[in-house]
Design a protein with these regions (language model features):
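Cys-dependent protein tyrosine phosphatase-like superfamily
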Residues: 1-95, 107-172
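Short cysteine clusters
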Residues: 98
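Conserved lysine of the Walker
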Residues: 104
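Substrate/cofactor-recognition hotspot
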Residues: 101
Length: 172
């Protein structure tokens, strides 16, 4: 289970693993905290790329990666891209966020938990709810919960995940 921590400028923040952190969209103070923690990559999963955040992250010497997606439409490509960033940067400390750090961030972390740590969909969904996952996103995102429950099957059958699974089997 993610270890919740409290820092100025970082809401809904937790350590998922020693190299993966999660939370809500950080402000200037939060970005400075992330830099002090040794974060090298900030993944923004908000619905659109933030030029302002990209500049602030770059000025602090971190790398900004936008993986924008609109909440009602989760798709395998988004999560494959997220997992690829993690796999391509095994020594980097990574922070992932969306606006509130609950629904999109929760789904990204759940995809990591199921793909890399072997969690069941129910275990991942339980953690998502502990970090504020709504499953219906204020009446907008009805398909989120069903997508997460079906994710293990997507992971096995969608070719977009094939490269990730091949890498994983080679590293064991």
């Amino acid at each position: 289970m993610g270890s919740r921590k409290h820092y100025i400028g970082l809401s809904n923040f937790a350590e998922v693993s020693p190299h993966l952190l999660r939370g809500a969209q950080p402000g200037a103070d939060g970005l400075k905290q992330l830099k002090e923690m040794g974060v090298g990559i900030v993944i923004d999963m908000c619905s659109s790329k933030s030029e302002h955040e990209e500049q602030a992250v770059s000025e602090l010497g971190m790398r900004y990666i936008a993986i924008p997606w609109h909440c009602p439409f989760p798709n395998d490509k988004t999560f494959a891209e997220f997992l690829k960033v993690i796999h391509d940067n095994p020594d980097a400390k990574i922070f992932v966020h969306c606006r509130l750090g609950d629904d999109r961030t929760g789904m990204a972390i759940a995809s990591y938990r199921m793909a890399d740590e072997g969690w069941s969909a129910d275990e991942a969904l339980k953690e998502m709810k502990e970090f504020g996952f709504h499953g219906w996103h204020r009446g907008v995102c009805f398909p989120l919960t069903s997508y997460e429950k079906d994710f293990p099957e997507h992971l096995k059958t969608n070719p977009v995940f094939q490269e990730l699974e091949t890498r994983k089997s080679l590293s064991h």
